[in-house]
């Protein structure tokens, strides 16, 4: 080609690179705006964020105008090249002209910005698959090298599927006052469709561009294909342009994000056990999603919803993308919420499903610590990139986390995607189930027992438990259900209104009556503690005070302290005041009063040797352990229900 064409091609290269830089700049601004919006929503004084948001929008408008001007210039250059090519054409079948035109089509849309060779026939093949188109979706910008909708061959089927799930706008009834949540896309309301209570995700825009409609249909098509107990159930959609809505099952407890704010003394508080179970359900949902060749790309507590039984489901697939089965190619672009983004996503590098694994690690840390990721360390998007990508900073892992949990977090948020485990690996290796056992059962032998017989179970029937536990302890047929030691153990482990042994109660009880090093010694210890006069096990200080009210001076109760492994003696002193004295057990030394100097081999010995100094006289007579002891000594039948003393409920032990 002549020099003029070469110069034009060089100008196209430069302008294309400038357009790409503007798009990247826009992406960063869009993500920074989203971060500021999140901060403003949670801030009591959002004025500062509002000012910064307005500034960023102004800068974005300037960049968009500049980008439009550059694209117009590009079009003029293309027109000039085509005109020159046609002028240069000497023969109808000139192959050099055909080759140049084909190359021009590639360079116009899929160009290698680092290629300084002006020979238009020399294009880097690795860049021939890049498509630098941008789409704003739900307030996040995405740049794709792979279509965010299903392949062309399935478009018709997708359209048919959308029609099949169509819900007429007149069938949708919702109350604007019953808002469940909101975001850049619009709002979610509680409503009724065909007589069923549902959640309705309603887009609040009134004018929709073609891209918005395509992305909406993509989300509908994707959700219609997903059926798993840990993925939010899609029930239909309204595709009327003026009333775009997605209908899903209603999740009564709302999002994990909102539940993270629950107070410790409420029923919705996320304990260690609940946090790990939420993580397990998330992994199960994400394993299914990735096996379906779909990446979520916005995994965070706000997109995990909880039903009335604490079953967790992954939700909000507005940013999700298909990935070709068995493809080694990676995707390009940025999507999601910055605080949960993987390093490669933050700097717009190629990525795969491991970005979801990184997001999972951040939300798992948040579940367990109840703190915002990075603890507000970064106030802007550039600061976040500098800290997470360049300095490789991660949230601080508390020392008290079980070793396996620390290891899982470190692996999942590894800087290098190839080192992160897949969701399938986490699920198959039962990593979270093992972490649950590690965190709830401190006794190593007891951990081994639960892992051997009940891996993956949070509660088991008493009849199954006692058979396997007896075998594990070395007893085959020597223990009878009528044995008082077995009955004492059941009183410790099984609530009066249940017949189930839970993993957390089993672990907690072992801190008081363990260790489980020798089966016979363990059952002997259970008997020696439970048969002590005045023993009331897991009675709270509040309930102990109620039991002792109106009793004689010196009446006492022996109970488990709220501090696992410690005991408390609650008694009525001579001034009719309720005193709670803590007793600490030290392995190998015995029992000692808090602040005392003498250790005793048994609790009974401690009480017998210190009753005068404490001013205790008579044990409280009542409760199931006292009733069982009396029944055993008199050969009378034991009525467990009648042995319980009704008191006002108390949450603390």
UniProtKB/Swiss-Prot annotation:
InterPro entries (alphabetical): Kinase-like_dom_sf, Prot_kinase_dom, Protein_kinase_ATP_BS, Ser-Thr/Tyr_kinase_cat_dom, Ser/Thr_kinase_AS, Ser/Thr_Kinases-Pseudokinases, SH2, SH2_dom_sf
Record keyword ATP-binding present: yes
EC annotation from Swiss-Prot or TrEMBL: 2.7.11.1
Active site positions: 298 (proton acceptor)
Disulfide bond annotation, renumbered to this chain: none
Region spans: Disordered: 112-133
GO cellular component: cytoplasm; membrane
Ranges where the Protein kinase domain occurs: 174-432
Compartments reported by the entry: Membrane
Gene Ontology molecular function: any one: protein serine kinase activity
Primary location: membrane
Parts forming coiled coils: none
Binding site for ATP: 180-188, 201
Protein keywords: ATP-binding, Kinase, Membrane, Nucleotide-binding, Serine/threonine-protein kinase, Transferase, Tyrosine-protein kinase
Short name of one Pfam family: PK_Tyr_Ser-Thr
Swiss-Prot/TrEMBL catalytic activity: L-seryl-[protein] + ATP = O-phospho-L-seryl-[protein] + ADP + H(+); L-threonyl-[protein] + ATP = O-phospho-L-threonyl-[protein] + ADP + H(+)
Family indicated by similarity: Belongs to the protein kinase superfamily. TKL Ser/Thr protein kinase family. SH2 domain-containing protein kinase subfamily.
UniProt-recorded name of the protein: Dual specificity protein kinase shkB
Organism: Dictyostelium discoideum
Gene: shkB
């Amino acid at each position: 080609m002549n020099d003029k064409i070469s110069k034009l091609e060089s100008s196209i290269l430069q302008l294309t690179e400038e357009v790409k830089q503007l798009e990247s700049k826009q992406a960063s601004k869009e993500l920074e705006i989203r971060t500021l919006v999140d901060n403003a929503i949670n801030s009591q004084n959002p004025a500062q964020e509002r000012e910064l948001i307005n500034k960023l929008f102004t800068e974005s408008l300037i960049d968009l105008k500049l980008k439009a001007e550059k694209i117009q210039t590009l079009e003029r250059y293309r027109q000039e090249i085509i005109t020159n090519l046609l002028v240069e054409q000497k023969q109808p079948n000139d192959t050099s002209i055909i080759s140049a035109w084909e190359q021009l089509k590639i360079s116009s849309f899929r160009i290698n910005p680092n290629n300084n060779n002006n020979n238009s026939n020399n294009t880097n093949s690795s860049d021939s698959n890049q498509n630098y188109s941008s789409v704003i979706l739900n307030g996040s910008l995405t740049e794709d090298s792979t279509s965010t909708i299903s392949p062309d061959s399935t478009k018709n089927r997708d359209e048919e599927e959308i029609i099949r799930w169509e819900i007429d706008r007149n069938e949708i009834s919702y109350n604007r006052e019953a808002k469940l949540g909101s975001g850049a896309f619009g709002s979610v309301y509680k409503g009724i469709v065909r007589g069923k209570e549902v959640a309705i995700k309603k887009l609040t825009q009134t004018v929709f561009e073609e891209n918005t409609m395509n992305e909406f249909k993509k989300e509908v098509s994707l959700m219609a294909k997903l059926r798993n107990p840990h993925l939010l159930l899609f029930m239909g959609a309204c595709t009327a342009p003026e009333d775009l809505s997605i209908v899903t099952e209603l999740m009564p407890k709302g999002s994990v994000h909102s539940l993270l704010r629950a107070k410790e003394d409420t029923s919705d508080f996320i304990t260690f056990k609940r946090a790990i179970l939420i993580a397990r359900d998330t992994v199960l949902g994400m394993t299914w999603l990735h096996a379906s060749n779909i990446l979520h790309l916005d995994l965070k507590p706000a997109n995990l919803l909880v039903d009335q039984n604490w079953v967790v489901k992954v939700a909000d697939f507005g940013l999700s993308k298909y990935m070709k089965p068995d493809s080694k190619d990676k995707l390009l672009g940025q999507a999601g919420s910055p605080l949960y983004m993987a390093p490669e996503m933050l700097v717009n590098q190629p990525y795969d499903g491991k970005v979801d694994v990184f997001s999972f690690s951040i939300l798992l840390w948040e579940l367990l610590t109840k703190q915002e990721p990075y603890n507000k360390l970064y106030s802007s998007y550039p600061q976040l990139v500098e800290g997470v990508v360049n300095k490789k900073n991660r949230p601080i892992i508390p020392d008290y986390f079980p070793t396996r949990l620390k290891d899982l977090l470190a692996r999942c948020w590894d800087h290098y995607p190839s080192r992160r485990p897949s969701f399938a690996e986490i699920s198959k290796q039962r990593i979270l189930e093992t972490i649950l056992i590690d965190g709830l059962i401190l006794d190593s032998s007891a951990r081994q027992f639960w892992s051997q017989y009940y891996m993956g179970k949070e509660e088991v029937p008493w009849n199954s438990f006692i058979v396997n536990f007896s075998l594990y302890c070395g007893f085959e047929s020597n223990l009878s259900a009528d044995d008082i030691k077995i009955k004492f153990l059941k009183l410790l482990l099984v609530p009066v209104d249940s017949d189930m042994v839970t993993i957390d109660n089993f672990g907690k009880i072992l801190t008081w009556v363990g260790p489980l090093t020798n089966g016979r010694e363990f059952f002997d210890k259970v008997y020696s503690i439970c048969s002590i006069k005045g023993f009331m096990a897991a009675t709270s200080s509040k309930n102990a005070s109620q039991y002792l009210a109106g009793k004689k001076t010196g009446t006492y109760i022996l109970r488990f302290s709220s501090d696992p492994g410690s005991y408390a003696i609650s008694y009525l002193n001579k001034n009719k005041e309720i005193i709670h004295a803590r007793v600490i057990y030290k392995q190998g030394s015995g029992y000692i009063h808090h602040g005392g100097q003498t250790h005793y081999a048994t609790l009974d010995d401690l009480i017998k040797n210190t009753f005068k100094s404490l001013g205790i006289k008579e044990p409280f007579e009542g409760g199931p352990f006292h009733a069982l002891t009396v029944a055993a000594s008199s050969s009378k039948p034991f009525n467990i229900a009648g042995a319980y003393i009704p008191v006002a409920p108390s949450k603390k032990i």
